[in-house]
Regions:
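Metal-cofactor-dependent catalytic cores
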Residues: 1-241
């Protein structure tokens, strides 16, 4: 894939499973894009982190990072969620917004059978330490325009959208983007989140995950660890390290 492929879009998601913000440039830290997955909403009773898998309503709120490192959350009705009570009222359960600096367990749930979700079991899994990534090997996620085709890139919540094709071939290699160097280590296995309805007119579509399972071994996008930190920008060219 390396050779002339550029960054088409950059995205970060300050609060896990909420809509994120599109950026022109961003610093890359050891934990991924600065401000990415720095907060998560937790169910107080169960102690589990909530995601759009179990609570699809999350995908209709949005978050952006403030200059002071806090997250500004906008609820589906356009109002701001200033505290845990507001979030709890919205979701109809007692919840708490927690930051990546806390010692909260990184435990979430995924549905076992997305085709029969209403009767399926749910399986707990442990995510990465520090920033609230699902996979410790995917601090930065990359996907190409060719791979997603006509699908909205927001379904896959990747950080870097590359204008090209063939990101799977990067697995096992080191690449440069702007000032950053990444070690691409894995293909990202997809889940029911990709089928969810979202803000902005994205409709529920089980065929998305069916297609990924059938044609791509259930994987779409690649995950990377950060070797060298630095700033990346839209238009930066992917290079070999």
């Amino acid at each position: 894939m390396v050779g002339g492929v550029q960054i088409a879009e950059l995205w970060r998601y300050p609060v896990k499973s909420l809509q994120g913000e599109r950026l022109d440039a961003v610093a890359v830290t050891a934990d991924g894009l600065e401000g990415d997955r720095q907060f998560a909403i937790y169910d107080v009773e169960s102690g589990l982190g909530l995601t759009g898998r179990r609570v699809p309503e999350l995908l209709f709120a949005s978050a952006r990072m403030r200059a002071d490192g806090t997250a500004e959350i906008t609820l589906p009705d356009g109002s701001m969620a200033g505290d845990d009570n507001t979030l709890s009222d919205w979701l109809g359960r007692s919840v708490a917004l927690r930051s990546a600096a806390t010692e909260a367990a990184r435990r979430y749930e995924n549905v076992v059978d997305f085709e029969h979700e209403s009767t399926s079991d749910w399986k707990p899994f442990d995510g990465a330490a520090r920033a609230f990534h699902d996979n410790p090997g995917a601090r930065v996620s990359l996907v190409s325009t060719a791979t997603i085709g006509s699908w909205d890139p927001r379904r896959f919540r990747a950080n870097v959208l590359l204008d090209g094709e063939g990101e799977d071939s990067l697995v096992g290699s080191r690449v440069t983007l702007g000032e950053a160097t990444l070690a691409v280590g894995l293909r990202i296995e997809r889940c029911v989140m990709t089928t969810r309805a979202q803000a902005g007119g994205i409709e529920r579509d089980l065929d998305v995950l069916r297609t990924i399972a059938r044609e791509r071994d259930a994987c779409l996008a690649v995950g990377a660890l950060v070797i060298d930190q630095g700033t990346i920008r839209v238009g930066d060219t992917l290079g070999a390290s």
